[in-house]
Amino acid sequence: MALRKTRISALATLLAATTASGNLLAEELRLITWGGYAPDEVVAQFEEETGIDVKITLSNNEDMISKLRATGGAGFDLAQPSQDRIVGVQRQFNIYKPIDYSRINTGQLQASMVNATQESTALDGQSYGVPSVWGTSGLIVHSSVADTVTDYTDLCDPAVAGKVSYRLKRPTLIGFAFAMGMDPFAAYEDRDEYQSILAKVEDKLIDCKDNVKTYWTGGDQLLSLLRTGEVTAAMAWDAGGWKLNAENPDIRFVAPESGALGWIDTFAIPRRSENEEAAYKWINFVMQPEIAAKITNASGNFTASKGADEFVNAELRDAYRLSFDEEAINNIKWYPPVPPGLEAMEGQVLDRVQAAN
C-alpha cells in the first residue's frame, strides 16, 4: 500500500510539473495592432528573450473597437488604438482597463508624448494609454520656397501662387486656426467658440483659393505633384515628406512655426486581458531605443522611444532630425478626442470652401 501511495504521489508530482511546464511553454500574448508595428524580427527577439509566444492580428481603429466591443474587452491582451479613439469608446463600451504606469519604463519614453497621451486618454482620473508610434501633419516644401513657407497660412503667400496643395479635411482647418493665433482644441467643448473659429478659417481658405493648384485627395497624387514641381508647397504628412527627401534633398518636411499636428497610436490593455503581465513586458521591450528603431524602419513612422532615432536607417534619421528638433517636438499639437457634432460643423465649412468661387 505504501509503495502504491508513493507511486501515485510521484505520478501526481510528474503530472503537475508537466502541466506547469506546458503552461509556461504555451504562454501567449495576443496583440491586435497596425501593419508594421510588430515586425517579424522584433517578435522573434521578444519570443526568444521571454519565452512568450506572440499572436498578431492586424487591424485599424474601427476594427479594434468592433472586435473588443463584441467581446466586452476579451480576445486580446494588448491593443494599439489611436489616442483620440480611447476615451469616448471607453466611456461608452468599457472595453479597456486603466494603465498602471508604475509598470511602464517611462524613462525610455519622450516625456511630452507621455504627458499628451496621459491627458488625452484620461477618464475619471485614470489614463488608458501609453504612447507608441506617432506621426504628424505639417508642410512639405521645395527648397526654393522654404524661406517663405514656414507656417500653414504661408500657403496663401503670393510667392507660391498656383503651386499649393492641401486637403479639404479637418487637419487643414485645425492647422490654419493655430497659424492664425487661435486654439481650436481648447474650443472643442464650446460649440459657439469653435464655430467662431471655423468662420474665420473659412474666410481665410476662401481667400486662399487662387493659390491652390488642387486639393489633394490621395497621398500618391500629392507626391507626384511635388515630384514634378507642379506643387512646391503643401500641407501633408511627415512620412510622405521624408520619402520625397530620400529621392530629392531639395524637398523636405517642415514642422510649422505654430506646431505640427500630431497623432499617437498607443498601447491599451483590453478589460478582459488574460495575460496583462506579458502585455507590459511587450510594451517595455519594444520601446527600448534599439528595438523601437526597428519598428520605425518597418513602418516609416517614428516611435515615442527616447533616443531611437540614433538607430534608424540613416536617410530616415537625417530627414527626421531636419524636421524635428526638441523644440519642434514639444510644440506638436496633439489631437484630442473629438466631441460629438464637430465633424458635421467642419463638413459644412469645407463644403462651402469647396463651392466658393
Where are these regions (language model features)?
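N-terminal signal peptide c-region/cleavage motif recognized by signal peptidases
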Residues: 17-21
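Early extracytoplasmic/lumenal segment of secretory-pathway proteins
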Residues: 27-89
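Extracytoplasmic ligand-binding site segments that recognize negatively charged/polar headgroups
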Residues: 80-223
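A ligand-binding cleft/hinge motif common to bilobed small-molecule-binding domains
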Residues: 85-88, 233-250
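A bilobed periplasmic-binding-protein/Venus flytrap-type ligand-binding module shared by bacterial periplasmic
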Residues: 138-145, 177-179, 264-275, 294-295
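Periplasmic-binding protein-like
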Residues: 198-208, 247-271
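Mature extracytoplasmic/periplasmic domains
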Residues: 261, 270-330
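Conserved C-terminal helix/tail region of periplasmic/extracytoplasmic solute-binding proteins
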Residues: 326-357
